[in-house]
């Protein structure tokens, strides 16, 4: 198993009377993923950081990865999964969105944190609720302009974060913690059920009005300011003053470096279109690729030190809370026959899910047509955002993608990391956001992309 030194900087978050009221402890441990965390008072140059320059591109994945392709019958069918890392890119610590619909903000900011690690060797933690506040005001404005037909909800896409970065900048979490209430450690995590109901009620009250006042946005902003805190116009970070825009500039991030990719047949390949899902309300123009080429982009990115923001559907039976995402061939009834098959047919869906995900089993072979059918009949929805950062293999040599979730480090059997099979990635990927330089050259040419 690959041995990788990981630096955890565990912050004890105090009552936010100061932007920098935190302490740090440094712990060196061994893990499958390179996880690096830092408080705003301390700059850490990680001992292991991917090269700033991409490696030589190849049109196919690494030879090691190619050998692991395919879906052979599992040789080791003992209970559980055992994973060995093949390749991984440095990431920051797993965060917890808790009871909020803000996975899109957490996952894409994690992606940008890895970008800063890649280019600067610097650890930073962005403020998700700054992005949420800015985005929800924009979404409310859109809903009102569309006469409230679109659903006003807390969901969003990776592009919302990139749009925010370009137009409003970003801030470190210490400048806007995003929690203004709570009496215990558990209460210091986002709980947005009340906020969502209040803001939906506010927007809903506008419906049917003959004329809107010019201050309705100010009223809505006051609600978000009350629950999340005001978005800072200026702040201090590591002894220097910044605006949200100058902070982004200091980190070398450029919104124009990032593009969204998808793979569906109801629009021409190698052209752009706005994927028709509710959370793409900004109508982000995504580049459309055949699924095989989209998978090549993912593999090439990881091989060259890039991560990806991943928009996916996790409602499938093979996506578990234990940290696994697979597409088991349920039609085979877990390879049962006779009386065992009869028992299988009589199982509840929860029990079937347990049986199909407790050990490596054969998976469905996913085609472009299967992807499209699942999208067209609403089996594939845009319900979750995560960060792809590595590859691994199980005890039988089958290949998986390592994905950072935002459900806290106590979720899953792998400290907040999920292992997603190639079949699941092919089937349930809605879109990915990636740096243009991470795309293989031949695909960039087809998309007519220029890079710096």
Report each predicted region and the residues it spans:
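Bacterial Sec-dependent N-terminal signal peptides
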Residues: 1-24, 63-66
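Terminal-region recognition feature
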Residues: 23-27, 389
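N-terminal regions that are enriched for targeting/export leaders
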Residues: 26-50, 69-89, 93
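Transition segments tied to proteolytic processing and entry into folded domains
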Residues: 34, 63, 373-376
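Active-site nucleophile-adjacent alpha helix/oxyanion-hole segment immediately C-terminal to the catalytic cysteine
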Residues: 83-252, 259-268, 273-280, 285-308, ...
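Active-site signature of cysteine proteases
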Residues: 218-452
């Amino acid at each position: 198993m690959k041995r990788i030194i990981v630096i955890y900087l565990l912050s004890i978050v105090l009552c936010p009377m100061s932007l920098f009221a935190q302490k740090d402890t440094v712990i060196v441990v061994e893990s499958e993923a390179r996880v690096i965390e830092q408080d705003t008072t301390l700059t850490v140059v990680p001992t292991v950081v991917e090269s700033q320059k991409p490696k030589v591109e190849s049109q196919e994945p690494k030879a090691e990865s190619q050998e692991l392709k395919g879906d052979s019958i599992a040789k080791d069918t003992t209970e559980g999964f055992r994973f060995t890392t093949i390749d991984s890119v440095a990431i920051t610590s797993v965060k917890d969105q808790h009871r909020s619909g803000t996975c899109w903000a957490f996952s894409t900011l994690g992606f940008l944190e890895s970008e800063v690690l890649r280019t600067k060797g610097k650890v930073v933690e962005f403020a998700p609720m700054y992005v949420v506040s800015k985005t929800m005001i924009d979404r409310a404005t859109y809903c009102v302009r569309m006469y409230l037909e679109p659903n006003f909800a807390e969901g969003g896409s990776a592009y919302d974060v990139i749009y925010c970065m370009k137009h409003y900048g970003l801030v470190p979490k210490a400048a806007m913690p995003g929690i203004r209430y709570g009496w215990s450690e558990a209460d210091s995590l986002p709980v947005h059920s009340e906020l969502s109901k209040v803001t939906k009620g506010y927007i809903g009250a506008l419906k049917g009005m003959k004329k809107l006042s010019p201050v309705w946005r100010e009223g809505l902003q006051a609600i978000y300011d009350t629950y999340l805190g005001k978005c800072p116009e200026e702040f201090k970070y590591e002894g220097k003053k910044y605006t949200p825009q100058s902070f982004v500039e200091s980190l070398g991030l450029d919104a124009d470096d990032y593009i969204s990719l998808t793979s569906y047949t109801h629009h021409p390949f190698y052209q752009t279109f706005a994927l028709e899902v509710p959370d793409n309300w900004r109508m982000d123009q995504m580049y459309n690729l055949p699924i095989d080429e989209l998978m090549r982009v993912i593999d090439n990115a990881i091989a060259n030190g890039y991560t990806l923001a991943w928009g996916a559907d996790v409602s499938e039976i093979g996506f578990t809370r234990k940290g696994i995402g697979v597409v088991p061939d349920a039609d085979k009834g877990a390879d049962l026959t006779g009386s065992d098959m009869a028992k299988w047919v009589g199982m509840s869906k929860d029990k079937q899910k347990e049986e199909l995900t407790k050990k490596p089993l054969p998976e469905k072979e996913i085609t472009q047509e299967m992807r499209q059918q699942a999208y067209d009949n609403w089996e594939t929805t845009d319900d979750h955002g995560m960060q792809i950062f590595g590859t691994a293999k199980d005890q039988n040599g089958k290949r998986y993608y390592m994905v950072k979730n935002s459900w806290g480090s106590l979720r899953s059997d792998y400290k907040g990391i999920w292992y997603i099979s190639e079949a699941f990635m092919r089937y349930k990927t809605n879109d990915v956001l990636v740096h243009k330089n991470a795309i293989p050259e031949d695909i960039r040419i087809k998309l007519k992309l220029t890079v710096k």
